[in-house]
């Protein structure tokens, strides 16, 4: 996944998502070639699902009120930051092995 996904989000939403990721609010992360699923803990626990095509998000869903109107939310951004961080960690780990 490249960094182009960040263009899907308003700057302040992206920053809030980064904070949620940094604060370890993303849990139960499942990442496959075609889909990402996770829970994000904030004021409540929200479910996020992201469909992928060629490693890029093509459809995103979150059950928070903000995303209910079709907006991209901080929970979606947090999950994508978490996937990016996990892939970076695994890549660095494989280089060391």
Sequence positions of predicted segments:
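Long, low-complexity, compositionally biased intrinsically disordered regions
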Residues: 1-97
């Amino acid at each position: 996944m490249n960094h182009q996904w960040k263009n899907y989000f308003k700057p302040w939403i992206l920053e809030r998502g980064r904070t949620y990721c940094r604060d370890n609010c993303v849990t139960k992360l499942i990442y496959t070639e075609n889909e990402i699923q996770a829970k994000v803990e904030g004021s409540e626990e929200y479910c996020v699902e992201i469909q992928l095509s060629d490693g890029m998000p093509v459809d995103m869903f979150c059950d928070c009120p903000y995303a209910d109107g079709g907006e991209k939310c901080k929970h979606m951004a947090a999950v994508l930051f978490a996937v990016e961080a996990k892939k970076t960690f695994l890549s660095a780990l494989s280089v060391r092995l």
